[in-house]
Amino acid sequence: MKNLVINCGSSSIKYQFIDMKDETVLAKGLVERIGIKGSVITHKVNGEKYVTETPMEDHKKAIKLVLDALLNDEYGVIKNIDEISAVGHRIVHGGEKYANSVLIDEDVMKSIEDCVSLAPLHNPPHIIGINACKELMPNVPMVAVFDTAFHQTIPDYAYMYAIPYEYYDKYKIRKYGFHGTSHKYVSRTAAEFIGKKVEDLKMVVCHMGNGASITAVENGKSVDTSMGFTPLGGLAMGTRSGDMDPAVVTFLMDKLNINASEVNNLLNKKSGIEGLSGISSDMRDIKKGNYVDKDPKAMLAYSVFNYKIKQFIGSYTAVMNGLDCLVFTGGIGENSFENRREICKNMDYLGIKIDDKKNDETMGIPMDISAEGSKVRVLVIPTNEELMIARDTKDIVGKLK
């Protein structure tokens, strides 16, 4: 079985083609600037990169180019389109309806469309991508894998906001959580790595990238997560503010004479560590400002980022009445030993101690960085959302036979 994984953005498509027999990535790539001048597809096979600049007026043309790349005489990996067993689509928002991945049919498409108001930037391109794939591969089964699905096990007292209940009834305002596919993959991989059943563990998974979230995983299920109604909630991120007093929103609107859309843009795209530092949304630049340049604002942004994560680790340990495993993943979580060191500092009371030498030597593979005598296992687990999507797709399509 060979599955194509598609992640459609408003002007881009990320893709991977995976042989599920041994979970080998046969090809992967990125289509950029769809509908914009200078559109390009970058296709990678066996470590070689093939870049093609060509006009792409829409997502259908872009997906046709992806299929052409997979079938290419020089660097293709299949001879016939029928070798694509199924397509797994990453969908950001599935609302309350889906706690698992599902085979896409008319009802599922309607549900994804119904969630457009909850994810106006993400769900519309997903819908366009699915429709394009259906046109080009009408006989290939399609599966929707939702970022929100893993968090549907969160109890109501953790996902409800203390505003009039009628707004939940009318508008479904509640915590949804995101990065669910990553948290699901990483929690299961971490349990397997330490030889335990995920159902027997209390874990905190820290997905730390430009977008960042933390999830409490108890007995294999999400019981709380830091992101909320939108991905703006929770931690201080690259350009997102994270949690703060809601009154700040109306205060800024009044003081700056801006509307709801403008304040939303400010909090999503001009805040976070970039807003605090005035330097960058990239943690590498912030670390340089902190350790090398001794820039006060960079030092502040770095400290705020780490502090918020430490806060959530403590909170979720309390929620689960204990902690067996702390896991770091995502671009920063996997690659920044400095951030991991700062976050785990002075966490002895929770039984968290890391070995500095092991922490400094992480290298893109699952690693245990716990110090000897640490009651909590501290792990670095590279995430692989595409593989999780491909696995879910395999499971669902396999049941059709």
UniProtKB/Swiss-Prot annotation:
Keywords: ATP-binding, Cytoplasm, Kinase, Magnesium, Metal-binding, Nucleotide-binding, Transferase. The active site is at 147 (proton donor/acceptor). Pathway: Metabolic intermediate biosynthesis; acetyl-CoA biosynthesis; acetyl-CoA from acetate: step 1/2. PROSITE patterns: ACETATE_KINASE_1, ACETATE_KINASE_2. The keyword Transferase applies. It catalyses: acetate + ATP = acetyl phosphate + ADP. Its EC number is 2.7.2.1. The record marks 179, 240 as: Transition state stabilizer. Substrate binds at residue 90. The keyword Oxidoreductase does not apply. It holds the Pfam family Acetate_kinase. One of its GO terms (molecular function) is acetate kinase activity. Its cofactor is Mg(2+); Mn(2+). It is found in: Cytoplasm. Its main location: cytoplasm. Mg(2+). Can also accept Mn(2+). One of its GO terms (biological process) is acetate biosynthetic process. SUPFAM superfamilies: Actin-like ATPase domain. It comes from the Bacteria. Mg(2+) binds at residues 7, 385. ATP binds at residues 14, 207-211, 282-284, 331-335. Signal peptide: none annotated. Catalyzes the formation of acetyl phosphate from acetate and ATP. Can also catalyze the reverse reaction. Homodimer. This is Acetate kinase.
